[in-house]
Amino acid sequence: ATNVFPSLLARNKLMTVPVYDYALMTEPLTSEQWDAIGWRDRQGIGDMANQFHYYRPTQDGRILFGGYDALYHYGRRVDPRYENRPEAWRRLASHFFTTFPQLEGLRFSHQWAGAIDTSTQFTAFFGTARGGRVAYAAGFTGLGVGSTRFAGNVMLDLLDGADTERTSLEMVRRRPLPFPPEPAAAIGINLTRRSLDCADHREGRRDLLLKTLDAVGLGFDS
């Protein structure tokens, strides 16, 4: 697994692209602040927007708040410089206070970013190489924490050549459509991001570009 870095297998080089995700962490909330927002069960939350946010409380009483931006850089570039994007954090902070207006004035103690690999089917794909001696999984699209254990078991099944319930799943057998090479990748991804944002502001109504991508099974997500 190479995560966001280029695949060592030529067949997979166009299967994923790296996108940058950004997150903020608040200072610890007081009991009064927790009461004000009514988040009693402290479960993790993700909204249903195309350019979605995710947020959850921490054990020491903070709120982790991230998402929205999923930024792609021309040529599938990965560079630590892309992790320092003040405008992304300012936008996230604005969205945070829109979500929790009761917490206006709360400060953020941490901010960070990182790249994830995304595939056109929004979930990992699997395969073998070197005559079946190597198994791989890639394209977790930000879902790796929950699915890597499953992926590890799938890869063990593939190495064993075993026909199991896992290896018979459509999501394991199917390969995603590849992303196009440059400059089509950058143009297509940025146009798609703009269309996704427009859909979020039009009660989810998708334009012709998104409907076409849906029809052919080609997508972009963070």
Give the ranges of each region predicted by the language model.
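Active-site substrate-recognition segment that forms the wall
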Residues: 1-32, 36-132, 212-222
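C-terminal lid/capping helical subdomain adjacent to the catalytic/cofactor pocket in oxidative enzymes
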Residues: 130-135, 141-222
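Short strand-loop junctions, especially beta-strand C-caps/beta-turns
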Residues: 68, 139-140
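Short beta->alpha junction loops/turns
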Residues: 115, 140-141
